[in-house]
């Protein structure tokens, strides 16, 4: 037993299981660390005005940041298996503080690429979705879907909810001051996790929440993290479920992070919607995303996850197609933001849960890391492609229509998916 066990409440003496404390710690760190992904997007114009760099020069590192965020997930899966959540959060926080400090003080383009492009993508990338998978898998038997929902919502909410505040701070005191929002918030959440966070319930003399029998601690992996990640991919690639989840989650990335997060503001500008209003629409999506994802986690514990995903993708596809053809007013966009926000990343809990059900509580999160990589690679392609399409055609309509149709294809694909067999823990 860990030496920290004495400092923690023994079994049966606390009404609140420490699993919920871990969810709270991971939620706070995920929200503030991923805010570093979203906040720079609303600072492009003031940075361009101060530094004299073009929008294109400032946008390219934004796409790199998003791609790195997704691409480092598979290796992060192996690292998380080998070293545990606490050490990985320690590494992530150090990278994040370095990236934000470099971004706040930058005057040269190499600082833009290294700080905003590389470090601010890598830092949340090594923990964000892995905490969403690993904490529920290790700490929960009961309410696992709800825990996944809470943590899954943190990622999208963090990237969106601080955008209006950052835009306002930038107008008042400059873009460098706006970057203090993720700096202060993530710094505090980082230190709190290092103080109170633990890798497993067994480290403090507990069993996972809802466990009816003692859950043994798996033997520590002896392979390096690259081998662990490749082994997870090898295990996943043998199953049809893996390819279906990777394909549909890539469509999730195309229709969320790759489209609306990056292009909703200029889409609104094409429709005559002021910048301030469109920035608040992203915040509304972020707030209702959290509600929708937590609700999705609750539903995952009660209903067939395959059919939940079919409904989620179907509603998202219809919403995107509607947005193209509707006579969109500010009120219409607000209604879209609420409805779309509820569905923005509601796909995460059932996707994670199906991964853990199929591949087990240890390997499942590492397999999901590869699925998540597909999500963000596709998002990065869409982010770039939608911008090029807009420049060539003068409209975002083809991009939004394509995303909507792909969502409907994803919805239909789950009707043919077999119920996964439960993998051993």
Regions found by a protein language model. Name each.
Residues 40-44, 234-293, 382:
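Extracytoplasmic gate region of multi-pass secondary transporters
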Residues 18-55, 73-76, 163, 259-265:
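Extracytoplasmic
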Residues 257, 277, 283-289, 295, ...:
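C-terminal transmembrane helical hairpin of 12-TM major facilitator-type secondary transporters
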Residues 94-107, 315-327:
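C-terminal ends and interior cores of transmembrane alpha-helices
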Residues 72-85, 293-304, 390-391:
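Helix-to-loop junctions at the C-terminal end of transmembrane segments
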Residues 31, 111-126, 250, 332-346:
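Hydrophobic core of transmembrane alpha-helices in multi-pass small-molecule transporters
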Residues 116-153:
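Cytoplasmic helix-loop-helix junction between adjacent transmembrane helices
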Residues 151-202:
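Helix-loop-helix hairpin linking two adjacent transmembrane segments in secondary transporters
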């Amino acid at each position: 037993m860990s030496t920290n066990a004495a400092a923690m409440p023994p079994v049966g003496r606390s009404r609140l299981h420490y699993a919920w404390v871990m969810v709270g710690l991971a939620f706070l760190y995920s929200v503030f660390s991923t805010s570093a992904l979203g906040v720079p997007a609303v600072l492009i114009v003031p940075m361009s005005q101060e530094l004299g760099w073009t929008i294109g020069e400032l946008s390219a590192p934004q796409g790199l940041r998003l791609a790195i965020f997704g691409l480092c997930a598979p290796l992060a899966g192996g690292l998380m298996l080998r070293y545990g959540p606490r050490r990985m959060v320690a590494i992530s926080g150090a990278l994040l503080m370095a990236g934000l400090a470099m971004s706040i003080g930058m005057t040269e383009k190499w600082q833009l690429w290294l700080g905003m492009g590389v470090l601010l993508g890598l830092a949340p990338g090594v923990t964000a979705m892995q905490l969403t998978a690993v904490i529920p898998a290790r700490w929960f038997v009961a309410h696992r879907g709800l825990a996944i929902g809470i943590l899954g919502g943190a990622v999208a909410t963090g990237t969106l909810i601080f955008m209006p505040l950052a835009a306002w701070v930038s107008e008042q005191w400059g873009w460098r001051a706006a970057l203090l929002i993720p700096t202060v918030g993530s710094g505090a959440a980082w230190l709190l996790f290092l103080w109170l966070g633990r890798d497993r319930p067994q480290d403090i003399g507990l069993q996972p929440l809802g466990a009816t029998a003692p859950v043994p601690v798996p033997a520590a992996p002896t392979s390096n993290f690259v081998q662990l990640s490749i082994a997870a991919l090898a295990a996943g690639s043998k199953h049809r479920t893996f390819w279906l989840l990777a394909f549909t989650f890539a469509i999730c990335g195309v229709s969320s992070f790759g489209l609306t997060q990056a292009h909703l503001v200029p889409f609104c500008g094409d429709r005559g919607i002021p910048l301030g209003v469109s920035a608040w629409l992203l915040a509304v999506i972020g707030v209702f995303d959290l509600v929708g994802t937590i609700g999705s986690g609750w539903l995952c514990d009660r209903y067939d996850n395959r059919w939940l995903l079919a409904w989620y993708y179907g509603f998202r596809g219809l919403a995107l197609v509607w947005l193209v053809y509707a006579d969109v007013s500010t009120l219409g966009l607000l209604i879209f933001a609420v409805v779309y926000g509820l569905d923005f990343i509601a796909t995460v809990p059932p996707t994670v849960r199906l991964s853990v059900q199929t591949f087990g509580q240890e390997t499942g999160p590492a397999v999901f890391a590869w699925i998540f990589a597909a999500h963000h690679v596709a998002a990065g392609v869409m982010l770039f492609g939608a911008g090029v399409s807009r420049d060539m055609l003068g409209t975002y309509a083809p991009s939004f229509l394509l995303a909507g149709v792909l969502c409907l294809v994803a919805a239909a694909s789950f009707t043919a998916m077999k119920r996964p067999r439960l993998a051993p823990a």
